[in-house]
Amino acid sequence: PRMARYAKTKRFSAKLGASWARTLQLVTLGAAIGIGAASQGCRTSNDDIDRWTTTAQGPRKLVAVLTHDKYPLEIRVEAAMGMVRMKARGGRRIGINGQDDQPGLLSALESIPPAVREKIVSRMVPRLEAEMKKEPPKAQAGQAAPADPSFDHKDAAYALLTHNEGTLVQGEEIKQRLRVALIDWSMTNFADRLEESSQLYGVEQVLRFLGADGVARLPPQLVPGAKKLDRMADLI
């Protein structure tokens, strides 16, 4: 009887362990891809990334793609850029900063091993640079000008440089490229960009972080009739 009870207990424990393993596997798969099958990961496309920037569960799916090593590097970079482009929800830029129960780009990058993170960030930088160089969209006749997407990319560049004392960006060359991109962006349409209320990090905050290099090109803009002369003078 004792051996029978032992065998029965062993079978029960094995069954319980298998059940728990299956549950854990399902939870892991759900977190990793936000859908019901692991095989979907290899089929994730840029179109999926674009769509997820606008859906309710999209932020979780983008984080899952960015952080999981089963996805190709380029689609992980695309997920990161999708989080940069994601519009504010409820007045919060959850793509970059996340929210209480949902990590954003910065927290997701922190969770990735440094060697892999460096590869992802180094591929993000040229795309951030390109978007920050684009001209603001023009207003159509009788309509307000569309939102300038370069603000989102500027915010991401600044966040990468400064989050957790700058540890997300490891290479000095990449750091310098981001700094130059931020200076160029800030010196373009300076007065207008100074007043944009939707940006996460104001132009003045960015320039103060960049120091003397950031404001070196402001003095030539101090001409009679220029907008925001007092603000420029304060920065210099």
What is each of the regions a protein language model found here?
Residues 2-42:
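Sec-dependent bacterial lipoprotein signal peptides
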Residues 42-236:
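Extended repeat-based scaffolds of very large eukaryotic assembly and lipid-transport proteins
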